[in-house]
Curated annotation (Swiss-Prot):
Record keyword Repeat present: yes
Organism: Mus musculus (Mouse)
Kelch repeat placement: 1-31, 32-79, 81-127, 128-175, 176-222, 224-278, 279-326
Name of the protein in its database record: Kelch domain-containing protein 8A
Top-rank taxon, per record: Eukaryota
Alphabetized Pfam families for the sequence: Kelch_1, Kelch_KLHDC2_KLHL20_DRC7
Keywords linked to the UniProt accession: Kelch repeat, Repeat
Length: 350
């Protein structure tokens, strides 16, 4: 696949969200993007639920989420959207699970989680949902792996994760669930563990070389990229924004040795990232001082270097993001206050 030139990338402003927010969750299904929950200007979780239609460039409000919450885990099962856990209006984790039927336009309560939790990582395969980790009411990280059986409407406990954590990144590849990073209380975890759905067992993979919070993970071809982030301050060490890039080779099963010349051009944490047209993209986030960034860059996997992209029209951090129809969408987040901006990075045909 021919990797596009950075000059061919452009940003486009799309219809803004109906209200400003942060920590909303995005999901693509049936060629549309759904935005669920989030926090308002006062940090109060919201019950908003909207769908974006790319043809009309329009957000349409749908029946409100029965339980207002932010930072929910979401997944699509055919024409149903499942919303799991998150933070409720009392600022505490919830155990509520709700399912929206797209054809009927209705919400239904489903069997609750075994314990209230926020920061759960969710993957789905063959109409089965797998929920890993989370943080409970006592602020302790969970090591639970639970599988939801849609036909029986019940959660079944599977082998616990070797490293308890919340806010991890998980993705499915074949019949394996890869779980990376996350946090325990305020501190970052560099554990990398893989659950085999068929053998129902966990394998520990080599740890992420650089431990940091607010980094991003992107998969592209047979590589997994761990990007940027914040090295947390402890005792005498100051917190530090990072340019670091670690790359895991899925075929060889190991982290590659990285030259400093392969690192990001700009130090950043809490940014938008995704794989787009054969390149790894990072945009916005928080940088030194700390300042909200507008800069964006694209990694060329053959040249092993980052190149500058056009800046984001609205500089911001803590955006929700999704790769959708060959675009990387940056939704909401924090600029000077909360933002309702929706912007798409795409490769122009010209």
């Amino acid at each position: 696949m021919e990797v596009p030139n950075v000059k061919d990338f452009q940003w486009k402003r799309l219809a803004p969200l109906p209200s400003r927010r942060v920590y909303c969750s995005l999901l693509e299904t049936g060629g549309q993007v759904y935005a669920i929950g989030g926090c308002d200007d006062n940090g109060v979780p919201m019950d908003c639920f909207e769908v974006y239609s790319p043809e009309a460039d329009q957000w349409t409000s749908l029946p409100s989420l029965p339980t207002a919450r932010a930072g929910v885990a979401i997944t699509a099962l055919g024409k149903r959207i499942m919303v799991i856990g998150g933070v409720g209006t009392n600022q505490l984790p919830v155990k509520v699970v709700e399912m929206y039927n797209i054809d009927e336009g209705k919400w239904k309560k489903r069997s609750v989680l075994r314990e209230a939790a926020m920061g759960i990582s969710v993957t789905a395969k063959d109409y089965r949902v797998y929920a890993a980790g989370g943080m409970g009411l006592d602020l302790r990280p969970h090591n639970y792996l639970q599988h939801y059986d849609m036909l029986k409407d019940m959660w079944v406990s599977l082998a616990p994760m070797p490293t308890p954590r919340y806010a991890a990144t998980s993705f499915l590849r074949g019949s394996k669930i890869y779980v990376l990073g996350g946090r325990q209380s305020k501190y970052a975890v560099n554990a990398f563990e893989v659950f085999d759905i068929e053998s129902r067992s966990w394998t520990k993979f080599p740890n992420i070389p650089c431990k940091r919070a607010f980094s991003s993970f992107v998969t592209l071809d047979n590589h997994l990229y761990s990007l940027g982030g914040l090295r947390q301050g402890r005792l005498y060490r100051q917190p530090k924004f990072l340019r670091t890039m670690d790359v895991f080779d899925m075929e060889q099963g190991g982290w590659l040795k990285m030259e400093r010349s392969f690192f990001l051009k700009k130090r950043r944490a809490d940014f938008v990232a995704g794989g787009l047209s054969g390149r790894v993209i990072v945009a916005g986030g928080l940088g030194n001082q700390p300042t909200v960034l507008e800069t964006a860059e694209a990694f060329h996997p053959e040249k092993n270097k980052w190149e500058a992209l056009p800046p984001m029209p609205t500089p911001r951090c803590a955006c929700s993001s999704i790769v959708f129809k060959n675009c990387l969408l940056a939704v909401g987040g924090v600029s000077q206050g909360l933002s309702d901006a929706v912007e798409a990075l795409f490769v122009s045909d010209s």
